[in-house]
Swiss-Prot record:
Cofactor note: Binds 1 zinc ion per subunit.
Top-level taxonomic group: Bacteria
Name of protein: Queuine tRNA-ribosyltransferase
Protein role: Catalyzes the base-exchange of a guanine (G) residue with the queuine precursor 7-aminomethyl-7-deazaguanine (PreQ1) at position 34 (anticodon wobble position) in tRNAs with GU(N) anticodons (tRNA-Asp, -Asn, -His and -Tyr). Catalysis occurs through a double-displacement mechanism. The nucleophile active site attacks the C1' of nucleotide 34 to detach the guanine base from the RNA, forming a covalent enzyme-RNA intermediate. The proton acceptor active site deprotonates the incoming PreQ1, allowing a nucleophilic attack on the C1' of the ribose to form the product.
């Protein structure tokens, strides 16, 4: 993988990730394909929304169908018939979400298989081996996702363990002679001094890109923005920056304003299945009765298959009848909305008009613009 930074507007960056399997224009949003599928979508449909890279889930694919089934097909790309780049998370977030059925040690994490109750062990080395078998174009290190809230002492211990695991991930990745990209994950909760130690430690080890982890886990938005403003300038300029598990459209806008290049989240697909649809002027709750006889399209500014062919009344009808097609059409639209948003951000950065884009975006959705730190305002001016 090669990252090319093309231009900037304030802290925001316009670039591209170059893989053997294709080019990803950044800032980029990655749809989530947890079990080797973006729920309800064929790979061709996902591609038509504008997505250039997907996220796969190491933990879930390890449990089902398992490494051996994957290798029978070649790798994850062949298994799911997606031939663009794939980023896989390390499994750390899912393991630490298991709560009482897992035990963290220096060596790794012991836990009960949530499917059948079997005792399983996942370590940095094992995560690297699984992701190698998946053929991931971007491999994520195995880390401890620090919960929120966490006091300073706990966050420090967690961050330091993640750094030790980062070294082990790097070592095993290199031993496997994996030629793809390996990203480090910056931890430290909401504490700037701990984030400083994490960034420096990871940069000293050396990675192909750097993710900001441990955000979007319940902390106030102001803390997320503060940490991004503090951390992003410390990441080497020639390496991509990835904000994990984020988020709402406004979170993507704010991440881009602060220098983030990559995002992923289940929100567009999960919300689509629940009838919450993102449009230029905010959110449409399609199951509300007011849409029962609305013959207009979902979003007159959208060029997706759903908006070109179906009315709000039809989408409302499908939702009320729990028809599978409704979830599919909703998902097509939400994914396209996210890709259109990212394309708009990229164009605004290219033209040096990002703040005008931001003003228009917030006016349309009827929300105030979150302030940038003073040094970021100076950069954008």
């Amino acid at each position: 993988m090669k990252y090319e930074l093309q231009t900037t507007d304030g802290r925001a960056r316009r670039g591209r990730l170059i893989f053997e399997r294709g080019v990803v224009e950044t800032p980029a949003f990655m749809p989530v394909g947890t079990y080797g599928t973006v729920k309800g979508m064929t790979p061709e449909e996902v591609k038509e929304t504008g997505a250039q890279i997907l996220l796969g889930n190491t933990f879930h694919l390890w449990l089902r169908p398992g490494q051996e089934i994957m290798k029978l097909h070649g790798d994850l790309h062949d298994f799911m018939n997606w031939h663009g780049p794939i980023l896989t998370d390390s499994g750390g977030f899912q393991v630490f979400s298991l709560g009482d059925i897992r035990k963290i040690t220096e060596q790794g994490v012991h836990f009960r298989n949530p499917i059948n109750g079997d005792s399983i062990f996942l370590s940095p080395e094992k995560s690297m081996e699984i992701q190698n078998d998946l053929g991931s174009d971007i491999v994520m290190i195995f880390d401890e996702c620090t919960p929120y809230p966490a006091d300073w002492d706990y966050a420090k211990r967690s961050m330091e363990m993640s750094l030790r695991w980062a070294k082990r991930s790097r070592q095993r990745f290199d031993e496997l002679e994996n030629k793809n990209a390996l990203f480090g994950i910056i931890q430290g909760s909401v504490y700037e001094d701990l984030r400083d130690v994490s960034v420096k430690g990871l940069v000293d080890i050396g990675f192909d890109g750097y993710a900001v982890g441990g955000l979007a886990v319940g902390e106030p938005k102001e803390d997320m923005h503060r940490i991004l403003e503090h951390v992003c300038p410390q990441i080497p300029e020639d390496k991509p920056r990835y904000l994990m598990g984020v988020g709402k459209p406004e979170d993507l806008v704010e991440g881009v304003r602060r220098g983030v290049d990559m995002f992923d989240c289940v929100m567009p697909t999960r919300n689509a299945r629940n009838g919450h649809l993102f449009v230029t002027d905010g959110v449409v709750k399609i199951r509300n009765a007011k849409h029962k006889d609305d013959v207009s399209s979902l979003d007159e500014h959208c060029d997706c298959y759903t908006c070109r062919n179906y009315s709000r009344a039809y989408l409302h009808h499908l939702d009320r009848c729990n028809e599978i097609l409704g979830a599919r059409l909703n998902t097509i639209h939400n994914l396209r909305y996210y890709q259109r948003l990212m394309a708009g951000l990229r164009q605004a950065i290219e033209e040096g008009k990002l703040e005008l884009f931001v003003v228009d975006f917030y006016q349309r959705i009827g929300k105030p613009i979150p302030p940038l730190a003073e040094k970021d305002v100076a950069a954008s001016n």
